[in-house]
Amino acid sequence: SIHLQYLDSSLVPLSKEDYDISDKSVIDKLTDLNPDVVIHAGAVTDSNVVNRNPISAIQTNIIGTAHLAQYCIEHNKRLVYISTDYVYDGVEGNHNETDPVLPYNNYAWTKLGGECSVRLVSNHVIIRTSFGNPKFPYDVAFDNLVTSKDYVDVIAPMILKIVKSDVTGIINVGTQSKTIFEYASQRNTVLPTKLPTPMNFSLNLNRYEQLF
């Protein structure tokens, strides 16, 4: 949300300390704030943390999302939910929005759980995407993991276009298919390494490209 604020000063980032979505009181706080649209990017995203403390992940990623959905339903607000490409199975790649989902890990299962409540909001959009910090944080990167992931400064403007539109439903957001090694090498010097099993989470981006 901070990156989105850099692009549009009318957007107001909300801190976890003041707006803890796992606490139902967040509904009353949002009622007082009265936003035009809710952009939900908050989540427990570290898969290791999710595995170690699944209850916390459930409280934030699933129950917290349900709280935001409840607010948006009760007050007729637009809800923009940042989901993950990992809800797809990662087998053949080029996943489109109507493909069956089979989350890759527990983190992705919690994000799919969040999607379920978001779908009940009449004016909702679910953005399936993947992005990283402006600099790749590791010295090695997988050359057999294919993705449409890009850096947050690339993806954030794409998300903002959706926020300002009247698009609803599910939409994939990313850039051209590449390996994680190729992605990392755009901005860093890294060495290639391999997953035990090759995976392909690349996204079919036709819907986004047709709309924007």
Question: Where would I find each of the regions flagged by the language model?
Answer:
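NAD(P)-cofactor binding segment of oxidoreductase domains
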Residues: 38, 52-80
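NAD(P)H-binding glycine-rich loop region in Rossmannoid oxidoreductase-like domains
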Residues: 24-60
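Mid/C-terminal beta-alpha module of Rossmann-like enzyme folds, strongest
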Residues: 158-204
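Substrate-positioning beta->alpha
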Residues: 136-163, 169
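N-terminal Rossmann NAD(P)H-binding glycine-rich loop of SDR-like oxidoreductase domains
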Residues: 1-8
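Active-site Tyr-X1-5-Lys
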Residues: 102-130
